[in-house]
């Protein structure tokens, strides 16, 4: 029979419980102290408790219940160690994230785009964001924008407790398909059979049976309006081609990009590289379609000097203060 308490069963099927996952076997230690807070359960506890980075524990440990929740703190909602307030790597302060602050404290780019890109120009070494940029995408930040204001889909504002509302929506009832395989403490949006947890989506997108539904426009200019994911994938492929024209090869392994000898580097080149990596996550279209599309379209234009051909362009704008000199 099914256990009375479902949370442990759900957690056991989550990525947070995968003992042999790369996230929890990645080399950590004194020379990689900044990795500890997210790649070690006890390291996260130390970080949340304000332990100096160089003193945080480096033991290999998955993210168990007591990593996110403090069993001895009844004052914090859900006994979460991090709640409501989180500062993203680019300095963006989120003060109303609720329980999603816990998610955002790790699922972010780990680097600031401006210092990353401009630092790459000075050093000649490519800088890219870390994996899992959901926190930035939900808050329309973290991409390299060349100083433009970017359009946004606004999921971060429209959905209360944004990360948790979608990834932890109730799992389907016992005895039904995908029970304990999506939602809840599985944190999964899709199970192995492709069944999606669209509970939160249905609140606004009535009648849709998938969160990867048809886009409103042809953003990649291929003459066909496809799904949101396909439009983003098309733009990313166009950006790969544009980077190749400028002497950059995209690799499937570290360091992810290779600049040909003799290539003229610039902010435009490094900014486009940053944005290509930033939008790599499969959730980019769902987290913030308009911001993702605008970043990719702008990167293409900055590289080649012209907009994506035949595409519906989401316009980025110069901030009013800069435009007027005020």
Q: What residue spans do the PLM features occupy?
A:
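Hydrophobic, helix-length membrane anchors
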Residues: 177-193, 197-231
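Short beta-strand-alpha-helix junction that forms the catalytic/metal-binding core
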Residues: 102-103, 164, 199-203
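Divalent metal-coordination and catalytic microenvironments
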Residues: 11, 102, 204, 299
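Mature extracytoplasmic or organellar-lumen-exposed domains after removal of signal/transit peptides
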Residues: 207-209, 214-326
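Generic detector of short, well-ordered, non-transmembrane alpha-helical segments enriched
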Residues: 7, 98-99, 197-200, 295
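Phosphate-binding glycine-rich loops and adjacent basic patches that engage nucleotide phosphates
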Residues: 1, 65-69, 205, 257-264
């Amino acid at each position: 029979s099914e256990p009375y308490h479902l949370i442990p069963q759900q957690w056991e099927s989550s990525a947070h419980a995968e003992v042999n996952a790369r996230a929890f076997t990645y080399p950590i230690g004194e020379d990689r102290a900044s990795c500890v807070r997210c790649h070690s359960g006890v390291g996260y506890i130390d970080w949340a408790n304000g332990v100096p980075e160089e003193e945080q524990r480096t033991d290999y440990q998955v993210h168990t219940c007591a990593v996110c929740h403090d069993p001895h703190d009844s004052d914090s909602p859900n006994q979460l160690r991090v709640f409501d307030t989180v500062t993203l790597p680019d300095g963006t302060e989120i003060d109303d994230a609720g329980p999603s602050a816990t998610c955002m404290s790790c699922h972010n780019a780990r680097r600031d785009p401006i210092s990353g890109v401009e630092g790459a120009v000075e050093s000649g070494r490519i800088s890219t964001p870390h994996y899992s940029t959901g926190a930035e995408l939900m808050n329309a930040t973290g991409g390299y924008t060349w100083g433009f204001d970017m359009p946004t889909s606004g999921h971060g504002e429209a959905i209360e407790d944004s990360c948790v509302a979608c990834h932890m929506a109730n799992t389907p009832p016992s005895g039904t398909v995908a029970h304990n395989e999506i939602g809840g403490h599985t944190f999964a949006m899709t199970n192995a059979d492709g069944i999606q947890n669209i509970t939160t989506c249905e609140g606004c997108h009535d009648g849709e049976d998938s969160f990867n539904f048809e886009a409103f426009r042809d953003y990649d200019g291929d003459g066909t309006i496809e799904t949101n994911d396909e439009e983003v994938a098309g733009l990313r492929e166009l950006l790969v081609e544009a980077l190749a024209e400028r002497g950059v090869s995209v690799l499937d392994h570290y360091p992810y990009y290779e600049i040909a000898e003799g290539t003229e580097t610039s902010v435009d080149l490094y900014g486009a590289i940053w944005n290509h990596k930033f939008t790599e996550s499969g959730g980019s279209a769902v987290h913030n379609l308009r911001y993702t599309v605008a970043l990719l379209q702008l990167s293409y234009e900055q590289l080649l000097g012209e907009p994506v051909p035949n595409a519906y362009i989401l316009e980025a704008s110069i901030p009013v203060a800069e435009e007027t000199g005020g």
